[in-house]
């Protein structure tokens, strides 16, 4: 949220914006999901059964796509997928409804409408003492990406 504010895409109190769901214009899904032998096989077992264990699931746009609400345990494998998306149809819908005008700077969003989006995906094994990344570190900064040439 703070990065979106720095770019001028969002404004106002970050906690209020997230609580209301304004951030979902740029990130309309959950942060990641459990993995089994295949990337999505755990959710195919039944998202509520695997990731919620009787806990209530949010109905808020964006948050309702979160696939895990149970505490992480050693041995779990989880993907973490932060990103940012500019979906023209969603921008038009929310802007037309004047949705979250206190939090979203739609004039600035228009400058990015044709960008598309980008997502970073990394997979982690939950251990007794924390988490271990599976695979190599993905380059994130412009300098790290340029160094791949």
Question: Residue ranges of each PLM-predicted region?
Answer:
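Active-site neighborhoods and metal-handling regions in enzymes and metal-associated proteins
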Residues: 1-149
């Amino acid at each position: 949220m703070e990065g979106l504010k720095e770019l001028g895409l969002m404004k106002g109190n970050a906690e209020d914006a997230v609580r209301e769901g304004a951030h979902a214009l740029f990130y309309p899904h959950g942060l990641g999901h459990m993995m089994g032998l295949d990337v999505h096989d755990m959710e195919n077992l039944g998202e509520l059964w695997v990731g919620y264990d009787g806990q209530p699931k949010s109905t808020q746009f964006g948050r309702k796509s979160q696939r895990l609400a149970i505490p992480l345990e050693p041995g779990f494998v989880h993907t973490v997928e932060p990103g940012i998306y500019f979906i023209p149809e969603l921008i038009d819908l929310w802007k037309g409804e004047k949705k979250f005008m206190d939090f979203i700077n739609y004039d600035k969003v228009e400058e990015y409408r044709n960008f598309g989006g980008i997502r970073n995906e990394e997979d982690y094994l939950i251990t007794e003492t924390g988490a271990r990344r599976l695979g190599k570190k993905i380059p994130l900064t412009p300098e790290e990406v340029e160094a791949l040439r």
